[in-house]
Amino acid sequence: MSELSVATGAVSTASSSIPMPAGVNPADLAAELAAVVTESVDEDYLLYECDGQWVLAAGVQAMVELDSDELRVIRDGVTRRQQWSGRPGAALGEAVDRLLLETDQAFGWVAFEFGVHRYGLQQRLAPHTPLARVFSPRTRIMVSEKEIRLFDAGIRHREAIDRLLATGVREVPQSRSVDVSDDPSGFRRRVAVAVDEIAAGRYHKVILSRCVEVPFAIDFPLTYRLGRRHNTPVRSFLLQLGGIRALGYSPELVTAVRADGVVITEPLAGTRALGRGPAIDRLARDDLESNSKEIVEHAISVRSSLEEITDIAEPGSAAVIDFMTVRERGSVQHLGSTIRARLDPSSDRMAALEALFPAVTASGIPKAAGVEAIFRLDECPRGLYSGAVVMLSADGGLDAALTLRAAYQVGGRTWLRAGAGIIEESEPEREFEETCEKLSTLTPYLVARQ
């Protein structure tokens, strides 16, 4: 098991295996299965890439919906509602643990707003604000370079796989792009306000973001396939769940909790463009590794993450095991670090998630002041953006990927979103340019829905 793996526990459901034919791309096959098996019947699903394996969780057996003012558990068409108070992680964790009494894995997403309760900002949320959606699937299909494994799969799932292996996946048509150069939300102006507030001592860092509207409907599975070929994410995902469609190439882990109690977080902060040719990329990397603004931004993010993980760790177990190395993520390169600890016996995976959520690299420092500034200066609510896509296992494991470099669709609206970390040395024009670089993870690879 790799350092960042989350064990899935022993399989207790009916399973079968199909050898993976040579030359078949597992990401392509998994995304096409999502299109054929789930989207064709308008069924909720989540596809999650983790450590060389794509897990397609198809169909909802039971769903946990956590809102700011209510918890709902939906099973067999029956919805049970209850009010909750205190920590959202405790409320969500208890409900998810019940799901995991009957299955090995659960999947879902956690909104940015899930993290505001820890900082006393829950009164800033509108009624019925979605905080999390987690479900146990009817069927799981795990795709890797070696094999395809099916759990509780029906005839139509097996037939879909046989058909795709026999005929091949669809060709990806020509992509379309969108213009990211406009600034209708006044991002540069908002950055300037944040710089003034930082200079006045209100906080040290804040991540501000901007949305880019996509003026056409996109084919999410095809876009995922095309974009995945050009990205090197730590995790990736494709989903239709809880009223939202999304796909993304996550650059970092918010939290990974292993069954043996090891906790990992991987803050990335500090950015330069990538993919402009070897010589230009080398110059950008050298600048990234020597630029005082980027180094300061990264160092204070690592310090904050280390303090947060210490809150839920066994005393003396928290350590930075990899500091400020360059991580390549598609169209950009980042300074990244890895922090590891051992979960204290008095804590659990939800306590670990809450301690590190929202990610310091998507909120601010100090985090309470940064989140408060986001409520005032950013386009809110953020929802899934800068939240997490999660996979949980019955053995206590958790894998939570930061939701960035993603496309979203709710109703008839499709959009992208990207942000930048603002510190006192920030320049509005450079921060705007950084959002353009991050948006380039997706903008060349948008496939219109036919």
Curated annotation (Swiss-Prot):
Changing H334M: Only the chorismate mutase activity is observed. It comes from the Bacteria. Changing T271A: Only the chorismate mutase activity is observed. Inhibited by (E)-3-(1-carboxyprop-1-enyloxy)-2-hydroxybenzoic acid (AMT), 3-(1-carboxy-2-phenylvinyloxy)-2-hydroxybenzoic acid (phenyl-AMT), 3-(1-carboxy-3-methylbut-1-enyloxy)-2-hydroxybenzoic acid, 3-(1-carboxybut-1-enyloxy)-2-hydroxybenzoic acid (ethyl-AMT), 3-(1-carboxyprop-1-enyloxy)-2-hydroxybenzoic acid (methyl-AMT), 3-(1-carboxy-2-cyclopropylethenyloxy)-2-hydroxybenzoic acid (cyclopropyl-AMT) and 3-(1-carboxy-3-methylbut-1-enyloxy)-2-hydroxybenzoic acid (isopropyl-AMT). Changing K205A: Only the chorismate mutase activity is observed. The active site is at E252 (proton donor). Its EC number is 5.4.99.5, 4.2.99.21, 5.4.4.2. The keyword Membrane does not apply. Keywords: Isomerase, Lyase, Magnesium, Metal-binding. At pH below 7.5, MtbI produces isochorismate and at pH 8 it produces salicylate. It catalyses: chorismate = isochorismate; isochorismate = salicylate + pyruvate; chorismate = prephenate. Induction: Induced by iron starvation conditions and during infection of human THP-1 macrophages. Transcriptionally repressed by IdeR and iron. Changing L268A: Only the chorismate mutase activity is observed. Its cofactor is Mg(2+). Disruption phenotype: Cells lacking this gene display a reduction in salicylic acid biosynthesis and a drastic decrease in production of mycobactin compared with the wild-type strain. Pfam families: Chorismate_bind. Belongs to the anthranilate synthase component I family. Salicylate synthase subfamily. Monomer. This is Salicylate synthase. The gene is mbtI.
